[in-house]
């Protein structure tokens, strides 16, 4: 029993630490990067852009939200938003946007795959369609890293299994 308690204690503490960050109020424009990182923790990725720094806070691979904190050259917060939604996906332009553009707009994908016949790389993002439906957006890139198509549909990980296989 003591060994079981020793094993369960770190797991319980990790779960409680994760719960503590769920209800953190969002940072406000004008806050410093240090203040944002102190409040939200270490970002899942940091992007250096010509306009300033961007911090990614992804909840994946099974989360349905990615938050981007964008800072100006003065390291003050310009915007903080959830990007896995219709307005976020609308920023991606088929035939124009690159993998880097998608990474800076939507953050890291939940899944990556390759379709050999059309020779397309696919980045998949889990999200809530209209805030209700468990969905996935699939962004397809050609060999040059240009977006060629975007398809959305139900998230297979959240779909009810109707058959035995």
Regions found by a protein language model. Give the residues of each.
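Bacterial N-terminal signal peptides that target proteins for export
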Residues: 1-9
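C-terminal motif of bacterial Sec signal peptides marking the signal peptidase cleavage site
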Residues: 15-18
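Residues within mature, well-folded domains
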Residues: 20-165
């Amino acid at each position: 029993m003591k060994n079981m308690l020793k094993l369960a204690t770190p797991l319980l503490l990790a779960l409680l630490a994760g719960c503590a960050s769920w209800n953190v109020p969002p940072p406000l424009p004008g806050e410093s990067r240090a203040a944002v990182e102190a409040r939200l923790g270490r970002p899942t990725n940091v992007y250096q852009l010509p306009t300033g720094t961007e911090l990614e806070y992804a909840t994946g691979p099974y989360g349905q939200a990615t938050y981007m904190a964008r800072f100006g050259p003065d390291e003050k917060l310009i915007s903080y938003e959830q990007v896995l939604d219709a307005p976020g996906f609308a920023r991606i332009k088929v035939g124009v946007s690159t993998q880097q553009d998608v990474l800076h707009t939507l953050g890291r994908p939940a899944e990556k795959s390759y379709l050999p016949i059309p020779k397309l790389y696919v980045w998949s993002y889990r999200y809530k369609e209209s805030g209700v439906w468990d969905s996935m957006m699939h962004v397809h890139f050609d060999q040059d890293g240009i977006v060629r198509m975007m398809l959305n549909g139900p998230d297979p990980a959240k779909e009810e299994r109707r058959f035995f296989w």
